[in-house]
Swiss-Prot record:
This is Nucleoside diphosphate kinase. The gene is ndk. GO terms for biological process: CTP biosynthetic process; GTP biosynthetic process; UTP biosynthetic process. NCBIfam families: PRK00668.1. ATP binds at residues 10, 58, 86, 92, 104, 114. It comes from Mycobacterium sp. (strain MCS). The active site is at residue 117. Its EC number is 2.7.4.6.
Length: 136
């Protein structure tokens, strides 16, 4: 069964010119890029995307980071796309929790600036895809 997930290449990944490397890893895994856009994230979209973190101590810095530069947003499809992308992304802490060979372990150093976001469940994927790609 084909599944869809939202993948974001965050401002640090775009700024460091890692978009091609990251998209290549997604495609080499066997996943399909069904939609792809370079976006400027405004405060409203950032707040809606990270609504679950509102009230947490890091919420402000999270919003500041995601709005600090362009983001590549993608709808990624394939069998078990959510789990497959999260596997190649690696743990959120790129130094202590990400497995070598993953995007974060190989290319990132700081937890907040960890290059990519991927939906964590089918429900999150549906909500996030609707936010970033309305009507898709």
């Amino acid at each position: 069964m084909t599944e869809r997930t939202l993948v974001l290449i965050k401002p640090d990944g775009v700024q460091r010119r890692l978009v091609g490397e990251i998209l290549g890893r997604i495609e080499r895994k066997g996943l399909t890029l069904a939609a792809l856009e370079l976006k400027t994230v405004d405060d409203e979209l950032a707040r809606r995307h990270y609504a679950e973190h509102e009230g947490k101590p890091f919420f402000g810095s999270l919003l500041e980071f995601i709005t600090s530069g362009p983001v590549v947003a993608a709808i990624v499809e394939g069998p078990r796309a959510i789990a497959a992308f999260r596997q190649i992304a690696g743990g959120t802490d790129p130094v202590e929790k990400a497995t070598p060979g993953t995007i974060r372990a190989d290319l990132a150093l700081v937890t907040q600036d960890n290059l990519v976001h991927g939906s964590d469940s089918p429900e999150s994927a549906a909500r996030e895809i609707d936010l970033w790609f309305p009507g898709r």
